[in-house]
Amino acid sequence: MKTLGEFIIEKQAEYPEAKGELSGILASIRLAAKIIHREINRAGLSQDILGFAGSENVQGETQMKLDIFANETMKKALLAREDVAGFASEEDDNFIAFDSERNRNAKYILMTDPLDGSSNIDVNVSVGTIFSIYKRISPIGSPVTIEDFLQEGRKQVAAGYVTYGSSTMLVYTTGNGVNGFTYDPSLGLFILSHPDMKMPAEGKYYSINEGQYVTFPLGVKKFIKYCQENDEASKRPYSSRYIGSLVSDFHRNLLKGGIYIYPTSTVYPQGKLRLLYEGNPMAFLAEQADGMATDGFQPILDIKPTELHQRVPFFIGSKTMVKQANTFMQTFTE
């Protein structure tokens, strides 16, 4: 049995020039995940953390009380160790430059969706936390700048998510494969349960909100019909599975094989998911697990961000299925 802490130390030992900052950040995320896990597990017993907060985030989306709690928990956990120079979140209007001397001398910045799928909390459906870590490009010792956050996804040094469901799991990559750790509440430890995770090249599930079908571009409509057609050779029709939480849908497809799609639409002309907080970290994980992630035309990780809350159409999952979806997008243009 190997714990997350032991795994981090073991991997750090493989890089003697490393000073442990990245390990410290992962330890902060581990702590935040435990705290968020605790609050989610008692959500049905406490009205203090259930329901709407009465505020909106920068995208105009109504914030849940747990959105704000998870966001503040991540900030506090990172500030306590001073291994991060700056922080950006889906829930905040602007990035935050941590301004202690040690923070200014830190090499990394972190971006997060602190509680993905939070609208599901009140009905006891699984949710998640997503995180993404980059090396800063501004001078060490100075406050971070917007350019530190607007880096292509390929420059990520680590990314991962925590899924809070029937069990709580932390899944992450540092660019050398994907590993999953299951939380044992009796021990208070994350235990390595899914080493070297690989996404099946082909899958049998497609995940998309078909209730918005009429708003989708033609290529997506054609691909949905393709998924529903009978074809013994390709083992179609595929099964539709859509939870409404990116982390939950991706996690199932990572284990079982499948594709998750959140395309452009007449309601969301640029797509709905955020490139920096959702797209890039999940795309990094997918590629490290032999999967694929695109906007229907190009790899997500190759997109140069232009703003903190930039939206992007999103196709992610088993490589064969994403390639098929890309073909439909590129063939059936409007």
Swiss-Prot record:
A single GO molecular function term of this UniProt record: fructose 1,6-bisphosphate 1-phosphatase activity
Residues that bind Mg(2+) 1: 90, 113, 115
Enzyme class: hydrolase
EC code: 3.1.3.11
Coiled coil: none
Subcellular location: Cytoplasm
Family matches, as Pfam families: FBPase, FBPase_C
A cellular-component GO term for this protein: cytosol
PROSITE patterns cross-referenced by the UniProt entry: FBPASE
Name under which the protein is recorded: Fructose-1,6-bisphosphatase class 1
